[in-house]
Curated annotation (Swiss-Prot):
Name of protein: Flagellar motor switch protein FliM
GO biological process per UniProt: bacterial-type flagellum-dependent swarming motility; positive chemotaxis
Lineage: Bacteria, Pseudomonadati, Pseudomonadota, Alphaproteobacteria, Caulobacterales
Cited CDD domains: FliM (cd17908)
Gene it is expressed from: fliM
Biased composition (Gly residues): 32-46
Keyword match Glycosyltransferase: no
InterPro entries in the cross-refs: CheC-like_sf, Flag_FliM, FliN-like_C, SpoA-like_sf
Amino acid sequence: MADELDDQAAMAQWASENPPGGGEGVNEFGDFSGGMGGWDDGGGDGASERILNQDEIDSLLGFDLSGDGSDDRTGIRAIINSALVSYERLPMLEIVFDRLVRLMTTSLRNFTSDNVEVSLDNISSIRFGDYLNSIPLPGILAVFRAEELDNYGLLTVDSNLIYSIVDVLLGGRRGTAAMRIEGRPYTTIERVLVQRMIDVVLHDLKSAFEPLHPVSFSLDRLETNPPFAAIARPANAAILVKLRIDMEDRGGRIELLLPYATLEPIRKMLLQQFMGEKFGRDNIWEGHLATELWTTQMEVRAVLDEQQVPLSRVLNMQVGDTLMLNATSRQPGGAARRRIPLTRGRMGRRNHSIAVRAEAPVDRRKKAVQKLK
């Protein structure tokens, strides 16, 4: 009993010397309580508690406040985004978009009559809702339809590229930055000029997909408010392609977003590897296969005669029965491979072996293959 009174007196003295909210006193009291917790654990009656600081909480939740632009996700955010399919699982996508960059470079040079350089900045996976919230405004969002895939895509043109294209097409001077007027909607002239550029990009996108699968892309509508350009659910995954367009000292960005639902009909084609100048072909393997086919061993049967007899006669056959054939020594027989006629010839004997001398060329026409089917 006296020990309990001594402990209570010591605790009261600590509380009077370290009032709540007192800076260093709180830390010392926290350390003391931690020590007592460890002493109580030894007795089996208490439990120690540790308060996480803000950095540890951010690390646990996966929030990166350093601003270094790293794409690595940790913590709960990594678990949430684990359902996203990486574009690297679709190897043909990178080939298609590389082809798109080359086509756009030529097309935009002809469209603007200026020196245009198109570069591929990044290809990544993102949730559609996160992308809508990250679109820089003001900008123009073009909703386009993939006819053969029966779905939609989204193309975003940022403000810098809009004013640069308008300035170039209307004869702006080189070496001067495009004039920007903020706080107003885009005019009809600006929207029409940007729409013409979008038509060029969609035509090049069609040509980029052509070797893989014919797809026609048609512009559906232009929007300036991201919620009105919703083509998928916020949680749906999509492929985001960022392109940089430079026209000497002017330029901007184009972002192309394709939901995975749009690419699903051609997903098997996107999974194949790129080989040679044509998609999915290997000339070395084709040559090897052709060589092996020429050396393939096949069984050929010589047919002397064919007759149709009743089933009852076949069932009553016994050892020693004789079958009369309607063939003579001068009548040509046939050579076949699994009932496919190959040639005709005469039956005879050569070096104590029965032989067939071919008297007609081997039928190389497609009829033989059709009979096999």
